[in-house]
Structure formats: C-alpha cells, structure tokens
Amino acid sequence: MAHKKGQGSTQNNRDSIGRRLGVKKFGGEFVRAGNIIIRQRGTATHAGNNVGMGKDHTIFALIDGFVKFERKDKDRKKVSVYPA
C-alpha cells in the first residue's frame, strides 16, 4: 500500500502562459522606425539591412520602410527594411 496520499491531481494542474513570440510585421508590410518585426528566442532569423537586434534577439526597424524577408545563405534567414 502507498504510504503517502495520492496528490497527482493537484500537482499536475499547472501551465505556463505563452510568451507571445513570432513575426509581428510580415513581408511587404510598411513599418516605422522602432517597430518590432520579430520576437524570437535565439537568432532563428538574423538582422539584415536597416534593422537592429535587441539583447533578447528581438528584431526591430531602424528606418521607415517596407519589410523584406531574405536568405542570408543556404540555411540562414534574414529580414531587412528598405525605404519606400
């Protein structure tokens, strides 16, 4: 017999809230300087022309313009902003 009470049901009933990661502005969309384009963990997408990267790897626009997703090389992506 068990020498402790069964407490699985109370211990298992938890879940962490979502982190709201992902693409916030899509290709061809107009952005203003400072707009967040992607929130990510790590550099799944790299910073291209006219975009900056925050310390949490958030990619944001440095100028007003249009978002363009490109390939950096065979297995890396980058995102750039080009003026209108």
UniProtKB/Swiss-Prot annotation:
Keyword Ribosomal protein on entry: yes
Superkingdom of this protein's organism: Bacteria
GO cellular component, one term: cytosolic large ribosomal subunit
Keywords for this protein: Ribonucleoprotein, Ribosomal protein
GO biological process: translation
Pfam families: Ribosomal_L27
InterPro entries, per the entry: Ribosomal_bL27, Ribosomal_bL27_CS
Cross-referenced Gene3D superfamilies: 2.40.50.100
Gene Ontology molecular functions: structural constituent of ribosome
Family in the record: Belongs to the bacterial ribosomal protein bL27 family.
Official protein name in the record: Large ribosomal subunit protein bL27
Organism: Campylobacter jejuni subsp. jejuni serotype O:2 (strain ATCC 700819 / NCTC 11168)
Gene name tied to this protein: rpmA
